[in-house]
Structures are given as structure tokens and as C-alpha cells.
Amino acid sequence: MDFFAGIVVFVFGAVVGSFLNVVILRLNTGQSIISGRSKCFTCAKKLKWYELLPIVSFVFFRGKCSACKAKISWQYPIIEIITGLLFLLIFNFQFSIFNEFSFYFLLSTFYFLIVFSVLIIIAIYDYHHQIIPNLFVWIFNGLAFLSLFNSFRISDFGFRILNWNNLLAGFILFAFFALLWGMSKGRWMGFGDAKLALGIGWFLGITEGVAAITLAFWIGAIVGVSLIYLNKNKYGMKSSIAFGPFMILGTAISFFWGEKIISFLF
């Protein structure tokens, strides 16, 4: 992918990231996620088009509302940047397989863009509310179920008979998290994590799925210990943090680099 194409893909991803922010903030609030103009949460000023430009508007207005000067959450540019970079990774990952634009390239890439957009919504919503939104986890699971009939990321792209190994992987990961949820009565894990694990198993298969969950526990442990060490007044051994974002981060890492990580370790 050349530099210009990379810029176009990143900008497209940032625009999608801006929309994902809207979905995350309006989800379960009674507001429509597809209609209604964006406005400042403090003064209710309706935003003009140039105030909605991804990343640029945040920098230009110095992270403040142009009317009331209330601070704007860093979530906006961070999600826009992450989505832009993620779209770049997906396009590079796909382009190296197909080496040319084709129907299969477009279909496969579109599939992965939707999958990871949904995962971003789940991760950020869970981070804020410590609950995985049921609607979007089942959208992800539905998309992951499709991958049982077409991996969407191998050179011999094509629909096939049901992948029983990946189907079983989903149920194994689901059972593991459901067991943790049941044994702890929801203190260790939420049932939403089990539903998310179901889709991760279908999407990645058993090897990369286990790698994703292992990474999630490692990263979660590092972050948890760091939070306790850096802010003992706010966090303690009994503090709870959302695990969904770590599961999704592990999924992304395993999706892009799982084979290299597994071959390095084993």
C-alpha cells in the first residue's frame, strides 16, 4: 500500500471512528444512534460540520467546545486514531493476501472492518459501564458465525462446509468463562464475557482463540497491578475493572500476529 492510499484508508477509519463514538455515547440512552445532530453535552450547542472533523477539530479547538469552552473527552480523538490505524492494519493484512483489488478483496476487507468496528464499540462501552452491550455482542457473534463457513482471510477464499473445529472452539471458550461466572456468582466475570468468548472462538479458532484469552489475562493482570501501584487510593485488590477490553485487545493481537506469537513461544 502506497503512502497516499494509506492516508485515504486512515482518514476513512477516523471518520468511522467518529461515528463509533456517537454509537457508544448514545447506546442505551434512548437517543437514536443513526439520526439527530451531534451537540455539546454541556451547553447543548448543535455542532457544525467543521466541528465534527475527526481529530482535526479536537486539535483546532484545543479539546474544548467552541461555545461554552467545556472540555471535550479525549475518547473522541483516541477512538478516531485507533480506528484509523486498525483500518490500515486490516487493509495491509488483506492486500498482502490478494495483491490486487477484486470482489473477494472488497468483500473480505469489508467483513473485517465491520467486525473490528463492532469490537471497538463493545470494548469502549464495557470500559465505561462494565457491561457488554447485548445487541453488539450478538452482532459480533453473528459475524463470527459466518467465518465458520468462510475464514475471509486465507488465499483460497471461498465458502465451505461448516468448520467444526472453530465451532467447538467457541463453545469451549464460552464454557470456560461461563464456569468462572457461575463459580464466582458474577464476581470474577460477567456473563457478557462468556458470550463474547463464544464469538472469539468462532472467529479465531481454538489455537488463536486461546492465545487471545491468554493475552487478555496477561495484559489485564499487568494493567490491574499497575493501577493499584499508581493509585492506591482509588484501586485495591477488590476493585473491579472491565475485562472485555482486554479480551478484544487480545483478539486483535492474535488476529494480526497470532501465528508469529505461537511459533515464537512453541
What are these regions (language model features)?
Residues S226-I253:
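Interfacial loop-to-transmembrane junctions
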Residues L20-Q75:
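Membrane-proximal soluble regions of multi-pass membrane proteins
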